[in-house]
């Protein structure tokens, strides 16, 4: 449908008024979009190539000095800043007789300036804000000494305005609301500002603050009617132009007196300062002069000049952008709303309030908020959708979208619900997608000036390919063999240890028995690389070159030998002692104060950091990231298997059912029923979720058959980063009868001649990290794309099984070896 629209030419509203066809603009101005679909313009839009070229020419042609000096270069800067300030006011039709513009870092900084000023007034202030407010608007309530109120509906606001008293005295009042919800694009009534002023008169102390950051990204803001305009308007220019990173506070001059009580002053905001016998200072007069502390970000302000020029040349006006983006949003909304599963159930559940009217510029902006549902009504996890979208080069946003009130309201969560979720571990930005049967966040798609119909088509095609169920899911059944002698056994095909978390594997040599501990294979994930600035553990998702860091465990010499990149005669090697108490730790310099906190998979973990510059330089140079090596402390009990997996393992601890001869259903998944008793979960070191990860060669083979059927390249088993790979020991006559995914039915298994017992804890949820080639460090879209179609359980994409050594096996040998026999057990 969309392709037909493209081929027919530009429909009414599509890039209307632009300097040329939008596809031509994109090809020339936005080369960064050549291999990606960008749908997060509400976060930031994109800068044009010619904007950067123009700004670069400006900087290399002109000499700009600090504007606080009187030199020629400084005066040039001052003149340009003054001109651009006026130009920015005119961009919003704001008469400089009635408005002043203060340059700030972003909209949040502008909000804080207003809230700080009212806090410093004699009686403080009362604060009211709309439920659809951005987090930064909500945060201002903490400064309101006279109290605050969240208005949960437009009707509540109207009722409050109706009872405002023009003669009230005491603390000032500030009412803040977004011109457009950054969550779903709903546009709120701008008439509120004028109505509040009419009710309270000019002499009253009730002010309005308009968060215009989301609105102005794709729509004109007209401040020409002074009587109807807000007292304070905040915005960020990068939302409009992509660059520069700069914000503005537009102040209605009649309200500028609130800043007179501001105590702090910075360089450039005063005419004189006395510091010795008398402590006195004289402030400058204009609003922007007393608020712009210190040296302005004058290069960013100068860049705004190029941004205004470029935007006008390419798009003509903000009105053109508004028409173009609302047409695209309407098209996308209609296409998504039409998607149905095989049984007629809707695929997309929108959070758009009343039916969005994209034709009405005062009602709806080009933002869509929604979640996806299965044919049975189950919620598809937002994190899983965003991960898969990233693999397919689609950039979207998920979560609470920095709009806590609007999101909670749309999802039906009360404050008590949210507190309960927080106590259960829910945090902003995590992957707790569904709690108590309801989503914890929302998916957001937003369009911008340079979006086109192909962006719309790409996202619709993505949802159709991966989330529209065209037929019921059917699990295949492997028939049980009539002759038990023909049944396949299993054996350990390979063992892999990952000494440094998220780095390459050390393959245990054939014929060598390897110790296995409660925490997993010996030396597995005992080290990690931590960012020297944040303390967070690095991972391949962000730094795929970590796959090329290849450790080797030399037990004979007692060292961990690390090599980076491809082998060469000049390649350097780092050796770390395996012994914690070894004297060599002095040279590799284990941190003298022993421990510092680090973040691993959301957990706060105490690690021991190597402070040697040689160690940090070795890894930092290769990854081009400031990092160093850290080790999990001995006898630490700070990390355990994830609770969701541990609850499943309780069943296996009590039930040991039939061995491999039992017929099974690969492709289906056992129901994990937690027991009432909860023994201590298995400990882990720096692994993500469990001590051991197991995969099956037969399952990898089946997955690759599916991948190759789509004319794509098969993947190696090592992309799954398993500790144990098991294979079927098939008799010759059953060579073509592998049983892929049979491990999904395993409840427990034994390994080796001593039958070392393992409990299966659950299936391994996969992310886009499996798309990193472990030999080259390159990203691909497989196998995650195929897994998303063939291995989805509810909202999770799974492959492989988590396991741990069973309780009560201390009396037997805890070793495994390549070639050991594996005997699985199945539930009844």
Swiss-Prot record:
Domain MOSC: 652-825
Cofactor: pyridoxal 5'-phosphate
Enzyme Commission identifier(s): 2.8.1.9
PROSITE patterns: MOSC
Catalytic activity: Mo-molybdopterin + L-cysteine + AH2 = thio-Mo-molybdopterin + L-alanine + A + H2O
Gene3D superfamilies referenced in this protein's UniProt entry, alphabetically: Aspartate Aminotransferase, domain 1, Type I PLP-dependent aspartate aminotransferase-like (Major domain)
Record GO biological process: Mo-molybdopterin cofactor biosynthetic process
GO terms assigned for molecular function: lyase activity; molybdenum cofactor sulfurtransferase activity; molybdenum ion binding; pyridoxal phosphate binding
Keywords: Molybdenum cofactor biosynthesis, Pyridoxal phosphate, Transferase
Protein name: Molybdenum cofactor sulfurase
Organism name: Aspergillus terreus (strain NIH 2624 / FGSC A1156)
Gene (UniProt): hxB
């Amino acid at each position: 449908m969309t392709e037909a629209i493209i081929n027919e030419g530009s429909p009414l509203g599509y890039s209307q008024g632009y300097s040329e066809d939008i596809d031509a603009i994109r090809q020339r101005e936005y080369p960064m979009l050549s291999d990606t679909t960008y749908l997060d313009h509400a976060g930031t839009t994109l800068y044009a190539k010619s904007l950067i070229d123009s700004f670069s020419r400006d900087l290399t042609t002109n000499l700009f000095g600090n504007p606080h000096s009187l030199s020629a270069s400084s005066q040039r800067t001052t003149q340009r800043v003054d001109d651009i300030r006026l130009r920015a006011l005119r961009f919003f039709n704001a008469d400089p007789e009635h408005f002043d513009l203060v340059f700030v870092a972003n909209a949040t900084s502008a909000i804080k300036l207003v809230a700080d000023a009212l806090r410093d007034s004699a009686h403080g202030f009362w604060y009211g804000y709309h439920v659809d407010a951005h987090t930064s608007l909500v945060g201002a309530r903490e400064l309101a000494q006279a109290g605050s109120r969240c208005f949960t509906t437009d009707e509540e606001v109207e009722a409050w305005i109706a009872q405002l008293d023009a003669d009230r005295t005491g603390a000032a009042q500030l009412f803040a609301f977004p011109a457009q919800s950054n969550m779903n694009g709903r546009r709120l009534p701008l008439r509120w500002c004028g109505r509040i002023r009419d009710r309270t008169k000019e002499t009253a102390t009730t002010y309005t603050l308009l968060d215009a950051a989301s609105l102005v990204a794709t729509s004109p803001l007209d401040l020409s009617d002074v009587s109807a305009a807000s007292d304070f308007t905040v915005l960020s220019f990068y939302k409009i132009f992509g660059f520069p990173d700069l914000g503005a506070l537009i102040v209605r001059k009649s309200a500028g007196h609130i800043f007179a009580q501001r105590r702090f002053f910075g360089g450039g905001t005063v005419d004189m300062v006395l510091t010795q016998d008398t402590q006195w200072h004289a402030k400058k007069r204009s609003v922007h002069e007393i608020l712009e502390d210190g040296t302005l970000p004058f290069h960013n302000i100068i860049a705004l000049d190029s941004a205004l020029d470029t935007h006008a040349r390419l798009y003509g006006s903000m009105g053109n952008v508004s028409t173009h983006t609302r047409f695209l949003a309407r098209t996308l909304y209609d296409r998504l709303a039409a998607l149905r599963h095989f049984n007629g159930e809707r695929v997309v559940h929108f959070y758009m309030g009343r039916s969005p009217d994209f034709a009405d510029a005062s009602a709806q902006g080009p933002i869509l908020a929604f979640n996806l549902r299965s044919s049975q009504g189950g919620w598809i996890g937002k994190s899983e959708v965003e991960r898969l979208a990233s693999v397919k080069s689609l950039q979207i946003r998920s979560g609470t979208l920095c709009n806590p009130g609007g999101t909670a309201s749309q999802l039906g969560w009360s404050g008590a619900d949210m507190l309960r979720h927080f106590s259960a571990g829910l945090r902003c930005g995590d992957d707790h997608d569904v709690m108590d049967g309801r989503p914890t966040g929302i998916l957001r798609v937003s369009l911008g000036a340079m979006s086109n119909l192909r962006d719309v088509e790409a996202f619709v095609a993505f949802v159709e390919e991966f989330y529209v169920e065209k037929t019921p899911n059917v699990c295949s059944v492997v028939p049980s063999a009539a002759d038990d002698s023909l049944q396949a056994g299993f054996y350990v095909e390979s063992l892999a240890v990952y000494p440094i978390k998220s780095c390459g594997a050390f393959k245990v040599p054939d014929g060598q028995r390897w110790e296995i501990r409660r925490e997993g294979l010996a030396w597995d994930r005992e080290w990690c690389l931590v960012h020297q600035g944040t303390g967070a553990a690095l991972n391949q998702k962000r730094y795929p070159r970590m796959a090329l860091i290849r450790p080797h465990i030399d037990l004979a010499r007692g060292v961990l030998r690390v090599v980076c990149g491809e082998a060469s005669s000049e390649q350097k090697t780092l050796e770390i002692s395996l012994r914690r108490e070894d004297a060599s730790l002095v040279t590799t310099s284990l941190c003298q104060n022993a421990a510092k906190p680090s973040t691993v998979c959301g957990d706060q973990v105490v690690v021991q950091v190597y402070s040697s510059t040689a160690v940090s330089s070795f890894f930092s140079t290769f990854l081009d990231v400031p990092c160093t090596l850290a080790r999990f402390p001995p006898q630490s009990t700070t990390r355990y298997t994830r609770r969701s997996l541990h609850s499943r393992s309780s069943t296996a601890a009590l039930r040991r059912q039939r061995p491999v001869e039992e017929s099974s259903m690969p492709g289906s998944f056992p129901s994990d029923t937690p027991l009432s008793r909860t023994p201590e979960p298995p400990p882990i070191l720096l692994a993500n979720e469990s001590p051991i990860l197991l995969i099956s060669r037969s399952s990898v083979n089946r997955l690759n058959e599916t991948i190759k059927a789509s004319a794509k390249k098969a993947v190696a088993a090592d992309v799954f980063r398993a500790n144990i790979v098991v294979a079927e020991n098939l008799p010759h006559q059953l060579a073509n009868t592998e049983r892929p995914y049979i491990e999904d039915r395993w409840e427990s298994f034994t390994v080796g001649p001593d039958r070392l017992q393992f409990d299966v804890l659950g299936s391994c949820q996969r992310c886009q990290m499996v798309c990193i080639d472990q030999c080259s460090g390159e990203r691909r879209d497989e196998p995650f794309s195929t897994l998303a179609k063939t291995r989805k359980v509810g909202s999770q994409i799974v492959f492989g099984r988590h396991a741990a050594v069973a309780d009560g096996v201390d009396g037997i040998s805890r070793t495994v070896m390549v070639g050991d026999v594996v005997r699985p057990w199945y539930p009844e």
